[in-house]
Amino acid sequence: MDNKEKLMERPINGVALRKVTTFSQKTEASNFAQRVLVNPFERNKILRMYHDAKRILEAKMPCPLMAVVYPSYVCNHNCQGCSCQELDIKENVFLDPQNFAKLLNSLRYLKIKSIEFSGGGEPTLHPKFGELAERAANEEFELGLLTNGSLLSDRLADQVVDHFTFIRVNIDASDMQIYNKMHCPPEKYGFQVVMNNLEEVISKKNKKNSKLTVGAKVLVCQSNMNFIESVINLAKDIGCDYIQFKPMRNAKDSLLPEQVGEVDGLIRALQEKYYPFLVCGGAKSSKSNRKCWLSPIHLVVDPLGDIYPCCHYQFRRESTRMGNLFDQPIEKIWFGERHKEVIRNLRVEDCNLYDCRWHYYNEVMWQIIEEDKMHLNFI
């Protein structure tokens, strides 16, 4: 037998069948799995929600899998197109720590398994953020964090490494000049501070042999479109596990229509060039022709305790607010008529103002369930 081949035996009905698989074939299959399946952005993991999606189409409300929690409505950066600017909330900007226990109890009642801390504002600006995260972790919630990274040092870095499943830091640029143009941060929360903090988190992760996934995020715009490869190199050299690109929307610096295709093509080419380092996303915006109906697979809670169907509520707060979990039992909010009314009143033209993964989720699950395009009764 050629030394490039390996014999694999597979018993069927007591008979050993000999199958020859070349190392090159195994490597190709392994590479495919790593490239296509084994990453946090594999969009087809929505298929695990098949039975819940069927319940929604049957006018039944499932329990959500994940909660997005906003600990803060304030931020120490001033980024273009940020929802924090649009909301412009001045009072009760932090989640009350005394209400956090009630929040966790409500999530547990709904059998929620994971919490993503994001914003809103910058979640780590909450004076008790580390304590809130530790409490949630001790109550066996899986945790994720979306952050600008400006406060990820010392004890908070340890808490993230010890208790979180993933963290994604919005870096946006590979040098201080472009970063400052996009983020407008105070000097003490600027580019070099963020990079130092990111390096500290990764160093602690490696020393502790933590399974934490550390990612970098880039909003692609006119200011950074010529520096795509350099920001990939930055994330890779620091030790990030991946970098994700998304288009900046609804801002003066958003890509012009004639720029989108070229930049998206560049990102696709760099995905191949830098493999196996994971380069995700692109520069094209998502749109949907179908009204959003899958929002109940998650919920969003703001610092006031108000519950919304998704994170893109900043310009339609009144029409999408479902209730307040600090004032009402969560079961009356989640399974109540107001929740159903909010879903009925969602408009696709509003949803298309933002780049949203639910565009894909809604379409795929509709085709699978209503149109049976996957022929699920066949393997």
Can you say where each PLM-predicted feature lies in the sequence?
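Glycine-centered loop/turn positions within well-structured domains
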Residues: 77, 176-177, 308, 328
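Conserved radical SAM core fold
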Residues: 123-124, 149-154, 169-188, 223, ...
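Conserved alpha-helical substructure of the radical SAM core
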Residues: 7-166, 192, 255-266, 363, ...
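Residue-level signal for well-ordered alpha-helical positions
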Residues: 85, 182-185, 313, 336
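Accessory C-terminal segments flanking Radical SAM cores
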Residues: 2-10, 15-19, 63-68, 248-252, ...
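Short, basic/glycine-rich phosphate-binding loops at helix/coil junctions
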Residues: 82, 175, 310
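Conserved C-terminal portion of the radical SAM core fold
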Residues: 66, 110-118, 137-144, 165-171, ...
